[in-house]
């Protein structure tokens, strides 16, 4: 009841704040089920040991990830486990971004490539626009902030 009254008070005094406050309260205690990006992703996503809400969680949910580490370390860690890495985007690849340049200066960022066009690629990502929020964006190619890509392996597609 107290929350309802507070929300009503916010609605009357600051209508622009209500949507943000409600979204934060609703998503914090119990994360909503995620939507698979590709038909070959298991119904509940791939097993995932990364913290919910982070970019690494979303990428690992939609890709078979066997390595650990912060986003900035994913390219090297995947390569060390024998995964192929490449300098160009492909559908299903994990895009690994360098720290800084609009991404976390300490941890870097990862996203999943969902489309590749002429001079662009489109990614699905979590925690780019806010904690726990999934968004898509189209990026111009070549991208100076990209470290590289981890493409899908045939054996990772059931």
Question: What feature does the model see in each segment?
Answer:
Residues 29-129:
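Secreted/periplasmic proteins that engage bacterial cell-wall peptidoglycan
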Residues 1-65, 87, 120, 133-158:
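Intrinsically disordered, low-complexity
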